[in-house]
Swiss-Prot record:
SUPFAM superfamilies tied to this protein: PLP-dependent transferases
Pfam families: SHMT
Listed pathway(s): One-carbon metabolism; tetrahydrofolate interconversion; Amino-acid biosynthesis; glycine biosynthesis; glycine from L-serine: step 1/1
Catalytic activity from the UniProt record: (6R)-5,10-methylene-5,6,7,8-tetrahydrofolate + glycine + H2O = (6S)-5,6,7,8-tetrahydrofolate + L-serine
Keywords: Amino-acid biosynthesis, Cytoplasm, One-carbon metabolism, Pyridoxal phosphate, Transferase
Lineage summary: Bacteria, Pseudomonadati, Pseudomonadota, Gammaproteobacteria, Pasteurellales
Descriptive protein name: Serine hydroxymethyltransferase
Annotated gene: glyA
Positions annotated to bind (6S)-5,6,7,8-tetrahydrofolate: 121, 125-127
InterPro entries, A to Z: PyrdxlP-dep_Trfase, PyrdxlP-dep_Trfase_major, PyrdxlP-dep_Trfase_small, Ser_HO-MeTrfase, Ser_HO-MeTrfase-like, Ser_HO-MeTrfase_PLP_BS, SHMT-like_dom
Length: 420
């Protein structure tokens, strides 16, 4: 028998110290990694529920285990809320991650060796869009499209490439692209060559849910997303479609279970249901509007301080700063900003002369800072501090500037806590 008074702090103090340290790090650092966000206490409460004990292989009403009546309620709630949120008529909430959702799409609709055409990782795509080190580039024949020197997708070049390689699937979506993707044009290209259009909207799902970024559902055969980036929910994946093809829906369900996964994580599905309910609230749209406003405000400061922004701006939650002209690497910038308690990630930029582990840029995202209450004035000030640190790298005053910036960061983090 377990007592509810049991706690980690008493039982495993070494682990608890790591948890406490991470809690403190999140409160005392400014989080600008575009793929991260803060989950609400309600989402975390669902994740910590007793549903973690329940096995529920199968789908609602068609389980392989008994005692799933409440798991069915939870999963159906999540499905219906996701349908309402995105305008889908098919939803699978079981994928454990975005990568597993993508794997299920490939497995359900393709055969090994089929050709896929996705955005190159070096140009802003994702590992699972056909990178050679990923299953998507090992199991399938992956062709890659890129972006122009201006940081934009060239749809004419994409069309020509699609006609040349004749893919069975075109993959839309990105992990580091700051402009609006023309989903309609991508579908037109896919139709011309008889390909599926699959869109991974993991990075912009929250913006899509709020109506601020174009919804790919009306154009794609199938869409996937994570639930923890701009959506702000638990770590997990999601598959959606409104194509109306029941055969595709059956293939996708079978590719998730039993082909790709066993039992679903019911406690995480419960947390997804909470996240979708939160995203249906009126204040969620205001939050996402502020995410975009804050990203645009930061871009203007970087440009004023003579830092090149890839594509010269942003129409979503992220942007890339190209450091080539300043003689800096992304690795050095990431490290210096980290010492000042500002967390970003190094990122490749178009025609990057550096290796992927070094890079010549940084990726900056605003979902987390916006969720903890930063407004446009706050992020403009923050962008200025970041430029101060970047300007000082390798100079005599570097340590002094970093220390001064860290003090400012700690002060604003105290004023705007993540969890008050």
């Amino acid at each position: 028998m377990f007592k509810k008074s049991m706690n980690i702090a008493d039982y495993d103090p070494v682990l608890w110290q790591a948890i406490e340290n991470e809690n403190r790090r999140q409160e005392e650092h400014i989080e600008l990694i575009a793929s991260e966000n803060y989950a609400s206490p309600r989402v975390m409460q669902a994740q910590g529920s007793q549903f973690t004990n329940k096995y529920a292989e199968g789908y609602p009403g068609k389980r392989y285990y008994g005692g799933c009546e409440y798991a069915d309620i939870v999963e159906q709630l999540a499905i219906e809320r996701a349908k309402e949120l995105f305008g889908a008529d098919y939803v699978n909430v079981q994928p454990h991650s975005g990568s597993q959702a993508n794997a299920a799409v490939y497995m359900g609709l393709l055969n090994p060796g089929d050709t896929i055409l996705g955005m190159s990782l070096a140009h802003g795509g994702h590992l699972t869009h056909g990178a050679s080190v990923s299953f998507s580039g090992k199991i399938y024949h992956a062709e890659q499209y890129g972006i122009t020197d201006e940081g934009l997708i060239d749809y004419d070049a994409l069309r020509k490439q699609a006609h040349d390689v004749k893919p069975k699937m075109i993959v839309g979506g990105f992990s580091a692209y700051s402009q609006v993707v023309d989903w309609k044009k991508m579908r037109e290209i896919a139709d011309e060559v008889g390909a599926y259009l699959f869109v991974d909207m993991a990075h912009v799902a929250g913006l899509v849910a709020a109506g601020i970024y174009p919804n790919p559902l009306p154009y794609a055969h199938v869409v996937t997303t994570t639930t923890h980036k701009t959506l702000g929910g638990p770590r997990g994946g999601l598959i959606l479609s409104s194509c109306g093809d029941e055969e595709i829906y059956k293939k996708l369900n079978s590719a998730v279970f039993p082909a790709g996964q066993g039992g679903p994580l019911v406690h995480i599905i419960a947390a997804k249901a909470v996240c979708f309910k939160e995203a249906l609230e009126p204040e969620y749209k205001v939050y996402q509007q502020n995410v975009l406003k804050n990203a645009k405000a930061m871009v203007e400061v970087f440009k004023q301080r003579c830092y090149k922004v890839v594509s010269n701006g942003t129409e979503n939650h992220l942007f890339l700063v190209d450091l080539v002209s300043h003689g800096l690497t992304g690795k050095a910038a990431d490290a210096a900003l980290g010492k000042a308690n500002i967390t970003v990630n190094k990122n490749s930029v178009p025609n990057d002369p550096q290796k992927p582990f070094i890079t010549s840029g940084i990726r900056v995202g605003t979902p987390s800072v916006t969720r903890r209450g930063f407004n446009e004035a706050d992020v403009k000030e923050l962008a200025g501090w970041m430029c101060d640190v970047l300007d000082a790298i390798g100079k005599d005053n570097e340590a002094e500037v970093i220390a001064d910036t860290k003090d400012k960061v700690l002060a604003i983090c105290k004023r705007l806590p993540v969890y008050a």
